[in-house]
Amino acid sequence: MTPAHLLILAAVCVSPLGASSNRPMPLNLYQFKNMIQCTVPSRSWWDFADYGCYCGRGGSGTPVDDLDRCCQVHDNCYNEAEKISGCWPYFKTYSYECSQGTLTCKGGNNACAAAVCDCDRLAAICFAGAPYNNNNYNIDLKARCQ
């Protein structure tokens, strides 16, 4: 691990421990989790963390179904957001609203935050519209995702 990675890891881990009375800003993945819970309240967000070839860490091969395709599109969306100068999608927070299952990215987000918010919003909406197949949870990636 490079010194830069260690510095980022330390900042992420230590910042919530500060003496400030204000709550720390959550990381983007926490916001994405909340978006998923907004559009798919019947499922735990963890159900999407290790699904198919693309939901979770990394991604390769052919998506196993429509839900996995949602994650592939989300990964590609993050890759596009990374092209914005200084944009790190996994750490970028944004302003959004959930109202009765409807997600809205609020105005006032900078270019990176707006892009990441839209990636997460579209993925959460896609998850809500795709069938969930329990057989595609925690699959053997080496065997099925070539």
UniProtKB/Swiss-Prot annotation:
CDD domains assigned to the protein according to its UniProt record, in alphabetical order: PLA2c
GO molecular function, one term: calcium ion binding
Compartments it resides in: Secreted
Active site: H74, D120
Propeptide section residues: 22-27
Keyword line: Blood coagulation cascade inhibiting toxin, Calcium, Disulfide bond, G-protein coupled acetylcholine receptor impairing toxin, G-protein coupled receptor impairing toxin, Hemostasis impairing toxin, Hydrolase, Lipid degradation, Lipid metabolism, Metal-binding, Neurotoxin, Secreted, Signal, Toxin
GO cellular component, one term: extracellular region
EC numbers for this chain: 3.1.1.4
InterPro entries: PLipase_A2 (IPR001211), PLipase_A2_Asp_AS (IPR033112), PLipase_A2_dom (IPR016090), PLipase_A2_dom_sf (IPR036444), PLipase_A2_His_AS (IPR033113)
Family, per entry: Belongs to the phospholipase A2 family. Group I subfamily. D49 sub-subfamily.
Binding site for Ca(2+): Y54, G56, G58, D75
Chief localization: secreted
Listed SUPFAM superfamilies: Phospholipase A2, PLA2
Record text on cofactor binding: Binds 1 Ca(2+) ion per subunit.
Signal peptide: 1-21
Co-factor(s): Ca(2+)
Quaternary structure note: Homodimer.
Name of the molecule in the record: Acidic phospholipase A2 1
BP GO terms, sorted: arachidonate secretion; fatty acid biosynthetic process; lipid catabolic process; phospholipid metabolic process; positive regulation of fibroblast proliferation
Paired cysteines (S-S): C38-C98, C53-C145, C55-C71, C70-C126, C77-C119, C87-C112, C105-C117
